[in-house]
Amino acid sequence: ALGDKVQFVEQNAANDIPTCATIVNGFVSDGVDLILANATPALQAAVAATDSIPILGTAVTEYGVALDIKDFNGTVGGNVSGTSDLAPLDQQAAMILELFPDAKKVGILYCSAEPNSVYQSDVVKAELEKSGVTVSVYTFADSNDVAAVTATACDENDVLYIPTDNTAASCTEAINNVAEPAGVPIVAGEEGICKGCGIATLSTDY
């Protein structure tokens, strides 16, 4: 069995970006043979730490955005490869319109520190606006202002959309505690967020 020949070292940064860097730098110092980076912050930390140790990304939404690669064609190159969990954004936008045909205002809620979320927001916003829906974007810097930003978004919109977003995923309880009493439904970009505070999603099956 592979486990008899390979030593696996698992470290959890708990969605803290500085901790990602600390963990990855430790891996580099230890001379590991491969780094598996789960989610965008971990991938970014790994790429910043080494250009020689092979890196595999997983649950990374959009590599071109995450690694600031212009004209990204699907191949990162160098020591980096991996898989993407990018959802069908056009179909998510269509689902919002199908579920809420009378909605006039849709708010998009995400963490401003996550470039993948910005990308998803831009795509979904453009798709919704094609149908004449007014779309407003609401961003929080970190978990500390999630509740306040969610409250503002709920006050001003008929429906909310939250893309695949690591910070939002860790704050679904806080988001739900605001949105549910306000009676504002949330369509989520991925399954975890949907389970925590959403009513529907169309996403990657993890």
Residue ranges and their predicted role:
Residues V60-E62, D85-P88, C111-N116, A141, ...:
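Short coil/turn segments
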Residues A1-F8, A126:
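Short, polar/charged alpha-helical segment
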Residues S81-E129:
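An alpha-beta-alpha
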